[in-house]
């Protein structure tokens, strides 16, 4: 009886450890690819003299500085998109929350808030507003292309 209990406990622990390992490994791979992508983007901006990144301390300081810039920016854009979706659900008949006008308003509000709330506070990152508009616009178009307005697949009626 105790042997079976320990065997089941070990099996559950082993299964949990395998799932946790896969989760951590996939997260590490994602963060590595994200880091390489952002490193490549920063090199492109520097090469074409569209951006200047002057914060250069230790690896962990750089990771914290530039990482917080990206995370705070993502939070702002995420919050604006969800707020705009909430407004669209609450006001479905409003012309501003349909079609291209909705996407233009979402993009404009997200870009403006990112610039004034996040970007201006990071003095070691110098990127012009129009470059930020192009980058966020490209990301917004990719989001619309790869994640279209889909239905909730969990609602079974």
Curated annotation (Swiss-Prot):
GO cellular component: plasma membrane
Alphabetical UniProt keywords: Cell membrane, Membrane, Transmembrane, Transmembrane helix, Transport
Pfam family, one: SepA
Places the protein is found: Cell membrane
Transport is among the record's keywords: yes
Membrane topology: Multi-pass membrane protein
InterPro entries xrefs: SepA
Main location per the UniProt record: membrane
Superkingdom of source: Bacteria
Transmembrane segments: 18-38, 63-83, 100-120, 122-142
Annotated function: Involved in multidrug efflux.
Family: Belongs to the multidrug resistance efflux pump SepA family.
Protein name (Swiss-Prot/TrEMBL): Multidrug resistance efflux pump SepA
Gene it is expressed from: sepA
């Amino acid at each position: 009886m105790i042997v079976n209990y320990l065997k089941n406990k070990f099996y559950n622990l082993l299964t949990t450890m395998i799932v946790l390992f896969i989760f951590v490994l996939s997260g590490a791979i994602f963060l590595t690819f994200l880091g390489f992508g952002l490193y490549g983007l920063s090199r492109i901006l520097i090469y074409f003299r569209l951006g200047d990144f002057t914060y250069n301390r230790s690896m962990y300081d750089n990771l914290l500085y530039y990482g917080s810039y990206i995370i705070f920016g993502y939070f702002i854009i995420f919050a604006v998109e969800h707020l705009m979706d909430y407004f669209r659900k609450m006001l479905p008949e409003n012309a501003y929350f349909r079609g291209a006008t909705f996407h233009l308003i979402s993009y404009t509000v997200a870009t403006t808030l990112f610039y004034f709330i996040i970007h201006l506070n990071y003095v070691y990152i110098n990127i012009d507003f129009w470059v930020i508009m192009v980058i966020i616009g490209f990301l917004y178009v990719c989001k619309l292309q790869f994640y279209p307005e889909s239905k909730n697949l969990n609602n079974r009626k």
